[in-house]
Amino acid sequence: MTNQKKFKRQETQIWQHLQWEPSPQQLEQFNQLQYLLREWNQKINLTRLIEGNDFWISQILDSLWPIQDELKFQDKQINIIDVGTGCGLPGLAVAIALPRSSTTLIDSIYRKTSAVKEIVKELGLLSRVNVLTERIELTGQKKLHRHTFDLAIARAVAKAPVLAEYLIPFLKPTGQAVMYKGKWNDLEKKELLKALSKLKGKIDTTKSLELPERRGIRHAIRISSTMLCPGKYPRSVGIPLKRPLNNQTSDNL
C-alpha cells in the first residue's frame, strides 16, 4: 500500500470516529494549519505533534472528538473560548470545524500568542478568531468576557478543580465547558465536585475515547453553571493553581 493510500485510509478512520467529515475547504485549512505549525515550530517551540498522525490523531481528532455535540449543528452561531491555547489547539481546529463560530484563544505566553496570531491571519480567520495574551484569572473577571461564552474549552492546562475555576466564569447561563483530560478517575471526580459546589456548577457528562494507534485514552468532562458564578471567581493570578477549590480552606487563604 502506498503512503498516500495509507494516509487516505487513516484520514477516513479519523472522520468515522467523529461521525463528521470536513468540507474540501475545511480539509484544506487543516492541511494549511499543519504547514503553518511546521513553519513556526522552526522559529519557536510550539508543539512536537506536527507530522503525520501525530498531527491528524493527536491534534485534530483529539481536538474535535469532545465537541461532537457541536459538530452535529456546525451551522449554529456560537461563541467559544479556548483557555491556555498554547500552539492554538484545540481552538483553531474547533474554529475550522465550526465555520459560524466566533472563537477567542487565550494564553499568557507572548511568543506563543504572537505565532498563533500570524497563523490565524494566514488561515483567513481574522474576522472570527481573536487571540489574547493575558492571564486567565484577569480575563475571567472582565465584563467583556465574563458570562459571554456558549462553549469554553481547555486541554492539558491544569487539574480539574483549577480548570473549573478558569472556565465556569466565562459561561453564559446556558453555556457549557469541556475539559480535555488524559487521566480521569473517581478521586479527580470527587475533587471536581467539591470545586463546582463553590462555583455553582455541575458535571453534565463524562465521555472517553481510546485514540487510534494506541495513543492512549482521553476523557472529556462537560460542566455547566447551575446559577451565575460568584463574582470572587476566578481568584487572583496564581491562586487557583496554588490553592485549588477542592481544598476546604482554599477560600480563606
Swiss-Prot record:
It is an enzyme of class 2 (transferase). The keyword Repressor does not apply. It comes from the Bacteria. Gene3D superfamilies: Vaccinia Virus protein VP39. Its EC number is 2.1.1.-. GO terms for cellular component: cytosol. It is found in: Cytoplasm. Keywords: Cytoplasm, Methyltransferase, rRNA processing, S-adenosyl-L-methionine, Transferase. S-adenosyl-L-methionine binds at residues 84, 89, 136-137, 155. One of its GO terms (molecular function) is rRNA (guanine-N7-)-methyltransferase activity. Specifically methylates the N7 position of a guanine in 16S rRNA. Belongs to the methyltransferase superfamily. RNA methyltransferase RsmG family. PANTHER family: S-ADENOSYL-L-METHIONINE-DEPENDENT METHYLTRANSFERASES SUPERFAMILY PROTEIN. This is Ribosomal RNA small subunit methyltransferase G. The gene is rsmG.
